[in-house]
Amino acid sequence: MAESSSNPTRINILGKDNIIIDHGIWLNFVAQDLLQNIKSSTYILITDTNLYATYVPSFQSVFEKAAPQDVRLLTYAIPPGEYSKGRDTKAEIEDWMLSHQCTRDTVIIALGGGVIGDMIGYVAATFMRGVRFVQVPTTLLAMVDSSIGGKTAIDVPMGKNLIGAFWQPERIYIDLTFLNTLPVREFINGMAEVIKTAAIWDESEFTTLEENAKAILEAVRSKNKSADRLAPIRDILKRIVLGSARVKAEVVSSDEREGGLRNLLNFGHSIGHAYEAILTPQVLHGEAVAIGMVKEAELARFLGVLKPSAVARLTKCIASYDLPTSLQDKRIVKLTAGKECPVDVLLQKMAVDKKNEGRKKKIVLLSAIGKTYEPKASVVEDRAIRIVLTPCIRVHAGVPKDLKVSVTPPGSKSISNRALTLAALGEGTTRIYNLLHSDDTQVMLNAVAQLQGASFSWEDSDVLVVKGNGGRLQATSTPLYLGNAGTASRFLTSVVALCNPTDVNSTVLTGNARMKQRPIGALVDALRANGVGVKYLEKEHSLPVQVDAAGGLAGGVMELAATISSQYVSSLLMAAPYAREPVTLRLVGGKPISQPYIDMTIAMMASFGVQVQRSAEDPNTYHIPQGTYKNPETYIVESDASSATYPLAVAAITGTTCTVPNIGSKSLQGDARFAIEVLRPMGCTVEQTDASTTVTGPPVGTLKAIPHVDMEPMTDAFLTASVLAAVASGTTQITGIANQRVKECNRIKAMKDELAKFGVTCNELEDGIEVTGIPYTELKNPTEGIYCYDDHRVAMSFGVLSTISPHPVLILERECTGKTWPGWWDTMSNYFKSHLEGEEEPHSSHVSHEKPRKGNPKSIFIIGMRGAGKSTAGKWMSEVLNRPLIDLDHELERREGQTIPEIIRSERGWEGFRKAELDLLEDVIKNNPTGHIFSCGGGIVESEAARKLLISYSQNGGIVLLVHRDTDQVVEYLMRDKTRPAYSENIREVYYRRKPWFEECSNFRYYSPHPDGSKALTEPPFDFSQFLSVICGHSNHLEEAKKKPQSSFVSLTVPNVSKALDIIPKVVVGSDAVELRVDLLEDYDPEFVAKQVALLRSAARIPIVYTVRTVSQGGKFPDDDYALALKLYRTGLQAGVEYLDLEMTMPDEVIEAVTNEKGYTHIIASHHDPKATLSWKNGGWIQYYNKALQHGDVVKLVGVARELSDNFALARFKASLAAAHDKPFIGLNMGTAGKLSRVLNGFLTPVSHPALPSKAAPGQLSAAEIRQALALIGELEPRSFYLFGKPISASRSPALHNALFRDNGLPHQYSLFETDNAADVKELIRATDFGGASVTIPLKLDIMPLLDEVSDAAKVIGAVNTIIPVGSGDKVTLRGDNTDWMGMVYALRNAGVVKVSKESPAAGMVVGSGGTTRAAVYALHDLGFAPIYVVARNADRIKALAESFPADYDIRSLSTPEEVAAESTAQPSVVISTIPADKPIEQSMREVLVASLRHPSVTNGKHVLLEMAYTPRHTPLMQLAEDAHWQTIPGLEVLAAQGWYQFQLWTGITPIYTDAQAAVMGN
């Protein structure tokens, strides 16, 4: 550590020079000063475990050399983080001190950040009624804030710092060298307190902070690994820390015990602490205070004591240090997993603030930068606080009569953005007055600074001083993020073309989701035509774009379509003087839109020294000379004329008077005409001078409609006109506003939809809107609130209408007005005296606009080698997703009217074929973007252009699926297949050449584990359906697992899945998912791993947890092979695994890549501590929890238990976090002592199985063992299950279910309850321990009225054989179902019967007409059989049966052999017998059956008879079928299968079928 070269600086506090500050004072100075001036027999150095090794041993060495022999230095370390700052740790330290015989002369040294300082200070304050201590802050936050002033405290469940004492340190040693090792986020965190101090006390210090933000951040973020990485800002650093510490010392000296003045140091903390209380520990103190400062400044602005410009300046300064300024900041959302901060909870947290007086909340209000409104915190009512904390605002009518106000709107956004652009491109310094302080201009300021185009500073809080660099801009590697700032995006697209290359040759402009929909195509076309390279990175014709650093336009003649936006024209005009030759700009395509804005740009360019000549011959042509803008000394920005329409409209609608003092007839802005051309014809009195406009409205309710008004010169003002027209008498027609469809939203549609909520009818016109007014007293209540589409003008317009609505109006998205008038709602409150209330967003609000549908509706493109199975996969996909399948080869032939071989043989050749193939691909991507499946030809990837299309499609949310199977199988198949054109080269060579192309084009890969010709290929196999459900976003496994009290996944520890296929079905029983330990596989080749996933999915039939466990985390994968790890993670994502375990020790770039590409796969963010370095008893795990919370859908933390109590510590840790976050959490301890943690974990517990070769982790239990343990400790209550019916004494059901309960570790019991009266079971099925029941004859129908709901199948069948209690506690619902038909289907499928396809129809037959017959008919229909023949004695019963089913079941009676012969084309291939087997078959039925079983058409294919009777086991009908060479299935198979399904419905566990079968058969 560097040492101080001169005497350190001292700061006086409370009359003593006790604050000592400099670089490098820790080692020599501190030890000597302590020993000389703060003498003691015992010094105790307390720090945290992160700092101990770095700073304690070296200090010990120095101290012990200098100390007398009778002086001792003890050291103690606690875990880092806020979690340690509590009663437990304090007690632990005190007990340790007592055990070391520490007495009242002890001096404690608190080395660390705020947590150490606060808590150790409180230990000092209370140990033996107070001992001396010194502060050695190591973080910036502690240096400037918590270490100074003697406030000490611990946290308690009710809040932070609520128990503590004032106890002044004897010394505060601030060694700035500590900051060299401070992590970037911690340094930035501390800057919040530095900004705070300057904001309340010293504007000159605040200006220093503004000017040095770039330099400070560059040094802090530098990759320089040297010990003195902050050397470039050494002097700045000392100045800002010294300045901040001095202010705090001065305030504390004046008011040590917080009588009033010291409250000022709490600026930003009242609201900030409330946020922190909810969001800790994921959000740091400084981050919460940064947001709190912005909110408290907005509060001061709302109360009318702080200028909007000061709020904007404070916000910009905070943002310039990369601190968050709102809860919507992407980093905050990510860090907290989107946790909400409800306003009522925030106000509750604020109610326990120490500054408050009783129930009155006190908040520090700024009156200017560097100055507070009062020399103490001010009392503020909850209503005002609620307004700034909530996203929505409710506006009540009630503007006072006879009101006369003067309102100055913010500077024009249009003029502000142009002024900033011109000043940044100009030479010299200019002062810009009345600049709009808004999101849009902030974006522009940030972007220009990033391009090094100009430097900015503030004077008198609201004058911006711009020093331009004369157009010398530098390309930047960091994308310019423009939010939804449309004006900035258009101006900057041309401006960045002026950049010179740096270490990068281009600049990327991007924005939010809405910005990525807004058009910019015409401007890009013009730039490209002039030689500037511009590339769309996502959607064509919209941001993001990558613009080459061209050093300026080429110049000459440029053409631009100007019918969509005049901003394109202004953008080129302003950049044109820096072209390499003079520019002639021609506007083509029709009359330019918004000509006044073009005129505004030209007039402003003249103010900055460049004269544009409009052509005399063609008014749409402009000549721009070469030159450099010369910045004027001052430039005054007019108020925004579009914004001025709102206060003027309030006067118009409420019959009051409003003056806008700085917009008149000589305005540059077209919207200045609004008062004369719209308000006057509507009945208002308008007085307009050159520079001001005054409007007085007619009596309320007497506005007149305007039959027609062309608002083309003032398009943005049409929204204001529309809300006035809504309450005017008659119909108003507004035209000339077509461009308003492509603004922040489609404003014409927005107006129509939102006015409809008030009961106002509008019609959309081609270029406008028609509004039919109604009396204002008849306006309806828009109960859901007004949705603003993130559009400032929509919000402000409806604010105007709300002032006379008979119902208070809720406006959603209050803050979107920040784009042009951040203080609009303050203006309504302070000037128009509107009563406003802040509200949370209602849950139902505008769901249709915002909430994405579950799943991905985009079309799917299938690629892959010829013969890989694309057509088959396409058919399966079409069936599963119910989407049309289009084979692009067939479609190409259809469109061309030629076969592909004919096209290739024609003069067009291969090149012509590939061109046609590419054109077709482009067409379907453009015209069929959703709801389709396209199977591409194998050679589509041969074309680079086609590859680019597919890559772009997959990167923009589309699915490009690569289908593949074993390469040898594909080659062998193609060698056999003579129906396709032959390859001109070796098949294998073709595949290996195309393989990298297939991989780069696809974002998902299906590796088929099914051998060619397997029975699975006749219908979609389970593994394929499961894969599809994940990649299309239809899987809800995580949601289902969260609802279960217990869930688990079994860890598969095999080197090759193909060698374990026989045991996999057994080991997955009772688990909700199966973990593939990729690190334990014998080969890490991605193709081998993909095959393992495919085989496992097919064999296990449950979701997959895909894990690559590194050596340091307890696995086998190399710790530092990050490239291969990322490749394997991507293999898992492309294979559509349900869960992917992502270790939080991976580098950030790996974590970011995986989380960005995860699609619908759920990330299990994990950290394992096999060496037991962390403890659940303190905050050691918190940093890993925070990181996992940020990146995972599930958090998984695994420690080691050395003793039983470690499991209870883990349980407490989990409980404390569960209260704050509902993210699923797997928390375990490894080792024998940790078994209890596995039993208690609950959610997705990793389990083993006795059949596996080894356990994946020490202490792992099987799922059955966990259930047994839960039963023993009372967490899994025994349930009673029954069979109801009569006679039932011979039933095999008890044997079946009790065996399965036993095998799966369940404590339940299944018993017989014999009765033929449903009333007898009424109380039994409502008992608290009732688990479920089987129902047999004669109660299958009688039981139904006793149930709460019945499944659709049971309704159609008309019988219930299973009762399932759903829910728990008081909310149990009894559901009836029927598993008889499921058992029949399973038994038939087991025998090889497959679902009937439409292409190959087949008939089925049922014998009998009793109760079970209905289930048999349902089963055959489910399998696709039609017609379904019924053979029975009673023709009337057959007729009644047929009529009771829907017509598409096609039920037909067969009563004679002749009828069998007549049905020769559709003889049954499956027969289900439901007649008793203990009596002979009735003769006429026997004849029909013999004729059918022995019909000549049944000699081919599979023919199966399923016998439902099971006594005797081999029935006469089975013999009859076997004699005719039919395959037969005995009735006990169905009994086993239906009971097997019942068990699944009751327990959620799917046992192995053969176990159920063995129990039934008595094996």
Curated annotation (Swiss-Prot):
HAMAP family the record matches: EPSP_synth (MF_00210), Pentafunct_AroM (MF_03143), Shikimate_kinase (MF_00109)
Species: Sordaria macrospora (strain ATCC MYA-333 / DSM 997 / K(L3346) / K-hell)
Keyword presence, Lipid biosynthesis: no
Region (3-dehydroquinate synthase), start-end ranges: 1-382
Protein's UniProt name: Pentafunctional AROM polypeptide
Family: In the N-terminal section; belongs to the sugar phosphate cyclases superfamily. Dehydroquinate synthase family.
Region feature (Disordered): 836-857
Residues binding ATP: G864, M865, R866, G867, A868, G869, K870, S871
3-dehydroquinase: annotated segments: 1052-1265
